A protein has these predicted regions:
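Juxtamembrane transmembrane-helix boundary motif
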Residues: 1-19, 33-39, 44, 65-151, ...
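Hydrophobic, membrane-facing alpha-helical anchors
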Residues: 1-6, 10, 53-64, 158-168
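Transmembrane helix-bundle signature of multi-pass membrane transporters/permeases
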Residues: 18, 48-56, 180-191, 244
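Transmembrane helix boundary and interhelical junction motifs in multipass membrane proteins
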Residues: 23-32, 157-167
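Membrane-interface alpha-helices at helix entry/exit sites of multi-pass transporters
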Residues: 42-50, 75-76, 173-184
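Membrane-embedded alpha-helical segments of transport systems
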Residues: 53-61, 86-90, 94, 186-193
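A small-residue-rich subset of transmembrane alpha-helices
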Residues: 54, 182-198, 208-221
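Short, structured loop/turn "capping" segments at alpha-beta junctions
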Residues: 126-127, 158-163, 174-178
Length: 258
């Protein structure tokens, strides 16, 4: 495996993962893992660890950008994050007891469908609409849906970015930018926990691949987050939808190759 091949694969993986994270709060694991497994022959468990470590800084820089533009609900984000982290552990414990199924494809298919939804039925909720929900109700919803997301993340082994975006926009009635900002904020911590546990269990990764993935994903996530915060809602819905459809289709293609 030449260094040039490694650079090209990690660059393309970083572009896809970064755009997905910055525009839609998508977990980098959905894009990076299949590419590393398919083209660089990296062992699946390690590929997920590298993808999650790429997620940490990309999500953090995206969350910072959304926060700077006042598109982040920190209070409810923190409540949801605690539920997600706690029940991810429960989910992964139960997943060990149940026969393993390849449910990773489920999250990729969901990414594709969510992309179609944003193009066909854009989320046009405004910040004013969000004020109609009481703080208490919002907090309770954050706990309940955090538990559901965490359990599914642990059980399926997915980052949960798409699930969070779907629930925040459709069930909790968040405006799109605030939903993405809150999703990447939560994902910074879930990805960090996941990356640390992967490397603790599976050993150190290929540092060259890991470093390149982290840097490329970070750069493209920053670019996408800046563009997303400047866009008007309709354009953002369309851009987010197109990014998700393309990434979903590409990853399904990689899975077929693998």
């Amino acid at each position: 495996m030449s260094l040039l091949t490694t650079i090209i694969v990690t660059f393309l993986a970083g572009v896809g993962a970064g755009l997905g994270t910055g525009f839609a709060g998508m977990s980098a694991a959905a894009v990076i893992s299949p590419m590393l497994i398919t083209f660089l022959g990296i062992e699946p468990y390690m590929a997920v660890g590298i993808a999650l470590s790429s997620d940490v800084l990309a999500s953090a820089v995206s969350a910072y950008t959304y926060h700077k533009n006042k598109n982040l609900d920190i209070k409810n984000g923190l409540i949801m994050m605690v539920s997600v982290l706690a029940f991810t552990v429960v989910g992964s414990f139960i997943a060990r007891l149940v026969p393993s199924t390849t449910m990773g494809n489920f999250s990729v298919f969901m990414t594709f469908l969510l992309g179609v939804k944003f193009i066909v039925r854009p989320v046009m909720t405004t910040k004013d609409d969000m004020l109609h929900v009481s703080a208490k109700k919002r907090a309770v919803q954050s706990v309940v849906y955090g538990i559901i997301i965490g359990f599914i993340c642990g059980f399926v082994g997915a980052g949960g970015g798409m699930m969070m975006l779907l629930l925040l926009t459709t069930v909790l009635g968040y405006e799109l930018k605030t939903a993405v900002g809150t999703s990447v904020f939560i994902m910074t911590f879930t990805a960090l926990t996941g990356a640390v546990s992967h490397f603790a269990i599976g050993g150190a990764p290929d540092w060259t691949v890991c470093f390149l993935c982290v840097v490329f994903t970070l750069i493209w996530a920053r670019i996408a987050a800046v563009l997303a915060n400047k866009a008007d809602p309709k354009t953002l819905n369309r851009a987010t939808g197109i990014v998700l459809v393309l990434l979903g289709a590409a990853v399904m293609g990689f899975n077929l190759l693998a």
